[in-house]
Amino acid sequence: MNQTNLLTTIPLRYQFPVRLLHLFAIIALASVTVTNAQPRSSQKRLTPAEPRPVSAPKRVAKTKPLTAANQRAAEKRLADLGYWTGRVDGRWDEASRQALIAFQKVERLKPTGQLTRADFEKLIAANRPSPLETGEAHIEVDLVRQALFIVDGGGVVTNILPVSSGSGKEFKSQGWARDAVTHPGRYRVREKLSGWKKSPLGELYYPVYFMYGTAIHGHPSVPTRPASHGCVRIPMFAAKRFNRMIPVGMPVIVHDGNPPPPIPTITGH
């Protein structure tokens, strides 16, 4: 039975609502057909994002802390290599710190005065430094490494101290402008004085003069960089003994890593 015959069997007063419902059904069906007929390319497909790989945290090797036994071994090793530690008694004091600074300077490490595990291992494996020159017993002042070496007649470095030489800056003294320079050259110890010596530029402790107005002397401040007016500063704890062990006339070689020229021979007419 088709739809027309079906409507004829329905009383007339019910046919209009039925036709209206039939029309709504046709419209709804058409809208669904149009929606489904849209091209698939207009519909975006959501692709789940791939998870980023998470790297495992890097493990940092822990540095083994130094023990009291390590400090005693470091102090003894410094003394064995010629660094001026004072009395080797296992106490890490100012003399020990200055000896370590001298070692760090000579080995071209950062002169912090702090004993690290890395510096301790380098110290244990280090050798006694070699002098710039051999022959007659003498003093060497290395302006580059800011260190002083006492060398015996056999060419062995017996003692090493950290120093601070001329800063290179200009200063005024007694109305004159001067440069704070420690000049490289070959000198000899001219004079030694005990105790404190007053000068226009300050006080010098147990000075050992090797050039007019220029001395190796103790000073409360010995920075790891050049900072003096031209003298060679050494730590206070070593100044008195240094003064007494160095004879007048001993050669002093001040250098910048290269041997300075020999002292010219002056002949009479």
Regions picked out by a protein language model, each given a short descriptive name:
Residues 38, 58, 132-134, 181-184, ...:
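Exported/periplasmic cell-wall-interacting domains
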Residues 62-71, 76-98, 102-122:
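Short acidic, glycine/serine/threonine-rich helix-capping segments at coil-helix boundaries
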Residues 101-180:
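Cell wall/extracellular polymer interaction/catalysis modules
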Residues 78-88, 103-111, 127, 152, ...:
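Sec/Tat-exported extracytoplasmic proteins
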